[in-house]
Amino acid sequence: MDLGALRGARVADLGCGIGRWAHYLADRCREIVLVDFSEAIFVARRHLGDRPNALFFMGDILALPFAPGSFDFVYSLGVLHHLPAPCLDVVRSLKPLAARHLYFLYYALDNRPAYFRWLLAGVTVLRKGLCRVRGERARWAITKFLLWGLYLPLIGLGRALDLVGLGRRVPLYEFYRDRSRARIEQDVYDRFFTRIEQRVTRADIETLRDTFRAVTISPDLPYWHFLCER
């Protein structure tokens, strides 16, 4: 989308975490409202507290206190698929807040070969077991093991096969080929220690046309991110 269109806009970042995306957008809009259910909101406030146009709320996306039309633009990137409610229903429920919405939801690997989905099925079984681990030191030890034993080898294989144009056939490679090791490690932690993970197909997202005037699904990574217009 055209970020220049946010000049003069009031923006909401739902599930802001530590404020990574808000840091990028704060200087591009009139006001940005950051919302998160966890104590990450305090980290976001520490990072962005010097921005006079930033407001911080600790709250539940499923029970927001904002009136219809409170914002010009709402976005939630990589959050709604971790909520205990169907993520597309949550998207529909947020429609009154703004005229334009941007979301990123985990994809169901519907545009990938079948073996991607087989690997995902195995990883999902592993995640459901690992998410019960509570000790932080144990979690980070497991994260390191998965980083070096699964993620980096696959990314390395993808990089090698990319020399002959076959890199995209390797799981994880396309998304992580330009990412730093620290970013990949954080993603491994987030991926395996969450209890709830929903995934959607492109066809699932298309059903949002029953609620929004227009739904534009990006053909580019990460899958799927899409813009909804009221």
Predicted regions: what is each one?
Residues 1-10, 24:
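Conserved alpha-helix/loop element of class I SAM-dependent methyltransferases that forms part
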Residues 14:
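Conserved beta-strand/loop positions that form the S-adenosyl-L-methionine
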Residues 18-63:
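Class I SAM-dependent methyltransferase SAM/SAH-binding core
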Residues 75:
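A conserved beta-strand element that flanks and buttresses the S-adenosyl-L-methionine
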Residues 88-100:
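A short glycine-rich, Lys/Arg-flanked "PGG" loop and its adjoining helix->strand segment in the class I
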Residues 100-142:
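Conserved class I S-adenosyl-L-methionine
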Residues 131-202:
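Substrate-binding/catalytic lobe of Class I Rossmann-like enzymes that use SAM or dcSAM, i.e.
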Residues 218-230:
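Core SAM-dependent methyltransferase catalytic element
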